């Protein structure tokens, strides 16, 4: 049970980081 929760949190963190990097790259390209 604990491993599933930690894996889920890791997945959310990875998706959030990817989203932030994607938005940052788009802002750099727009400028």
From Swiss-Prot:
Its main location: plastid. Keywords: Chloroplast, Electron transport, Membrane, Photosynthesis, Plastid, Thylakoid, Transmembrane, Transmembrane helix, Transport. It is found in: Plastid, Chloroplast thylakoid membrane. Belongs to the PetL family. The 4 large subunits of the cytochrome b6-f complex are cytochrome b6, subunit IV (17 kDa polypeptide, PetD), cytochrome f and the Rieske protein, while the 4 small subunits are PetG, PetL, PetM and PetN. The complex functions as a dimer. Component of the cytochrome b6-f complex, which mediates electron transfer between photosystem II (PSII) and photosystem I (PSI), cyclic electron flow around PSI, and state transitions. PetL is important for photoautotrophic growth as well as for electron transfer efficiency and stability of the cytochrome b6-f complex. PANTHER family: CYTOCHROME B6-F COMPLEX SUBUNIT 6. This is Cytochrome b6-f complex subunit 6. It comes from Marchantia polymorpha.
